Amino acid sequence: MNKTNKEILRLALPSIVSNITVPLLGLADLTIVGHIGNENYIGAIAIGSMIFNIMYWILGFLRMGTSGMTSQAYGKKVWEEAIRVLFRALTIGVGMGIIFIICQSVIEWIMICAMNTPGSSLPLVHSYFHIVIWGAPAMLGLYGLNGWFIGMQNTKIPMLIAIVQNLINIFASLLFVFGVGWKIEGVASGTLIAQWSGFLIALFFVHRGLKNKTFYTSLTITQLSFSLFKSTLTHIEAWQRFFSVNRDIFLRTLCLVAVNLFFTSAGGKQGALILSVNTLLMTMFTLFSYFMDGFAYAGEALSGKLYGANNKNGFMQMVHSLFGFGGIMVILFTAIYTLSGKNFLHLLTDNSSVICASLPYLVWTYFIPLTGVAGFIYDGIFIGMTETKGMLITSAIAMVCFFAFYYIAKPFWENNALWIAFLLFLSLRGILQFFWAKKFVLNRFSASNKKI
């Protein structure tokens, strides 16, 4: 195995482990509330978690933009700029979290109305939301911190933070629910404590990672904070670039959110059974995404580093290696879904009517790996290169094609049209990004490449 492949695996594998911990935590929360009351508790956790998932998913630009700009600073070995990128991300992330807390009643009303929350679950959702919202500054700050660690070529720390955070969440929730008797408030409090714990642990690792840097150790914390605050606020051009990069990623994320929410909504309009079928089958995309996101994160870190170092040959070798690993993932997941797709459905549910209704649509999941792989890899490359305009334009075009195809084909193919439209969306993202990269991305290495 060559050096590039080793670097990719070194960065990708911890990220995959981090991603896998996410559903395990959700399963733990559902298991806890499943033993404290009726179905309203389970529904409240599901709705409350979805509210925060949507909020934080939309703001994922904080992690991605920070990762790209930090990795470029890493490639140039300009450590002062790397820490300034983090300072900007923390300023925006924590600031937005505070705004969320101030506007929590308005946010709750909008999200509950949008999700058609059942009246029986409303008081429980209210209790959960108004506790967990106090973790918004920590969560959004942690987005910036995790992006910074990835940009600094370290995915082991985000993995460690995710594992510790999840363990704290589980044990704190168990203590508050069964020890103190707080019910859903106990689960929410466990989540809140875990979020702030993860944020503080991340700050500790930042301090430890920078303590051998001259510009960091030559100053006291007060002097450093003032120096960063002054230089960060007065560097207007850097702020403009920071907002430009994150604006593009934000709008691109809205395109992805629109497609995913519409997919769920369109399935729901076909009835509860089809909604259950689509939810079940979509877990195959989710599982594939957990693995591919790991390679995308590796692409972010290495693309930015190699671009910062103006190493075009190394960049091309890295791209070829990423697609090599992507090809392996396609073969592996296609084989698993084709040979064991039905068994996977039985693993997820024992409802025979849902399983039977899923079988006619199971074939579409076989194409998820092939159609989705390029989009994941190019996302990582584009983020590392901060080629965010290309990400936005290609995602917007793919989204428009998704809706156009669905509404044209819906009268003829119904739910099949929805799945084909989704596969078309995945395919177009990868195809369009390929042509964008060919025309715009590689040419950037011929420039002076002085701007971070």
What spans do the regions from the language model cover?
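Short alpha-helical transmembrane segments in multi-pass integral membrane proteins
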Residues: 1-15, 70-137, 179-246, 303-368, ...
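N-terminal transmembrane alpha-helices
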Residues: 3-36, 50-65, 69, 94-101, ...
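Transmembrane helical elements of multi-pass membrane transporters/channels
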Residues: 10-29, 131, 142, 151, ...
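Membrane-helix boundary and inter-helical linker elements of multi-pass secondary transporters
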Residues: 35, 72-75, 151, 180, ...
